[in-house]
Amino acid sequence: YRLGLTSASVSVPKENRYKQPFTKGMTEGGSLASYQFNTYKSVKKQEFSELIFFEADSKARKVTEESCSVCEEVNFCRSLVDEIGAVMTPKVFADTITGRAQAYGIECEIWDEKRIHEEGLGALEAVGKGSANPPRFIILRYNGGSDSEKRLGLVGKGVTYDTGGYCLKPGAGMMDMKDDMGGAAAVCSAVIAAAKQKLKINITAVVGACENSIDAG
């Protein structure tokens, strides 16, 4: 997009051994490099939206589709992290993840602050108590494998805004206060990517989402 391009056409190498890695690399490079977070910009740059491959066989097409699917979730993850903390509260994060995950048949379970207290999640409850935005506990279950298959567990840190609490971060750390939910965004996006590709595995992702911020009220 730095060149102002919105589309590109690429001729795939004729040698079969190069077709799949070539199309995979081009797809990932184009998708990831063209990502932009323009939500709050009055003047938005043109988006790169189309990449056309010539002479790609069925295997290369399959690799391209898989790469596109993964890159979509990588960019979804990036958009969650890029969103400002005043918007991406624990509840909004939970609702956003749930809406996207359920579209691909992923089981979603969200605990509110009352359930968090009842289940004895004291650390999550304690951190979230200082904020006006209560915490959420998120569980995603993707059941793509058989019941006898081992289950992969993923855990991601979900502090949607981390001021440092009573010990405020210095000015140099303020730009990154909203980034402490990157782990949560990554594991949730990974589960969604697995479900989109219908991988034959079982995955559970667990996220404790909260704000480490002292409410002025």
Describe the residue ranges of each PLM region.
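Alpha-helical metal-binding/catalytic segments enriched in His/Glu/Asp
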Residues: 97, 152-154, 163, 167-211
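Short amphipathic alpha-helical segment within the helicase RecA-like ATPase core
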Residues: 1-151, 155-158
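Flexible glycine/proline-rich, aromatic-decorated loop/lid segments
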Residues: 213-217
